[in-house]
Amino acid sequence: MRVAVIQQANSADLAANMDRSEALVRDAAAQGAELVMLQELHRSLYFCQTEDTDCFDLAETIPGPSTERLGQLARELDIVLVGSLFEKRATGLYHNTAVVLERDGSLAGIYRKMHIPDDPGFYEKFYFTPGDARFNSGASGFTPIQTSVGKLGLLVCWDQWYPEAARLMALAGADMLLYPTAIGWAPADDDAEKQRQLNAWITIQRAHGIANGLPVLVANRTGFEAAPPDGGDGIQFWGNSFISGPQGEFLAQADADSETVLLHDIDLQRSETVRRIWPYLRDRRIDAYEDLTCRFRD
């Protein structure tokens, strides 16, 4: 199955961002992609660099204008399309939500980001409520979304640092792990620190694929986005979107600075082959992991 991840640079022009996303999705579909994933919050600039109540105006309902447009695009191109939105769930209640549109344009499912960061330049707790542990008719927040191309273990950005999230998706039968992302460097970081951060980000996601015997798709944004005048120094998003296999092998990788339609033909049967020789799920000591639900083992 041919998959595509979209690496895009954004501007303050919401309409232009969506037009550009659509053009890149069309490019991917023209090259035979059946599953296409956009980056985190692809409709706008990364507004979480500062805490500003006016930014809540960017939020929209699901279903809403963006899911309608993405659904029409998925139906026209006969693809499964993964988008990422600032969701207004109710008055005063907002989420960072990934959406999956089926080939017929219907909404196959949503995933509300579970782990919410609050770091300099990434003030997401101001805007986003964490996803519910259980939603969508009682399903766990870490439940794959069933589609015509497989069961998608869809997570979002900061979730990618947590092995528990990937494991729970795998235990629920995910065929692949997907991470729409918005991450980059602070301009004040020196080159050595930047390289350490990038290497850690790539390594941990590939490790989730290895530990669970699954392919991994990662879509990050690229380009420099200045902070608002009362904010910080801006963020240089580091791109490097990639696709890796169930042994962590690189299948495709973008560079840091270019808008990219990254494609690869993945074989979902390889997970069966890999899990036979590396039977991690078989050898888990489920009787010994109770303390994983503790905040800390005091």
Segments predicted by a language model, with ranges:
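Short beta-strand segments enriched in small/hydrophobic residues
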Residues: 1-8
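Active-site beta-strand/loop signature of hydrolases that rely on acidic residues for catalysis
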Residues: 3, 17, 25-54, 74, ...
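Short, active-site-adjacent cap segments at secondary-structure transitions
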Residues: 43-46, 89, 224
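Short beta-strand scaffold segments in enzyme catalytic cores
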Residues: 83-85, 97-100, 143, 241-243, ...
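A conserved C-terminal secondary-structure "cap"
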Residues: 271-298
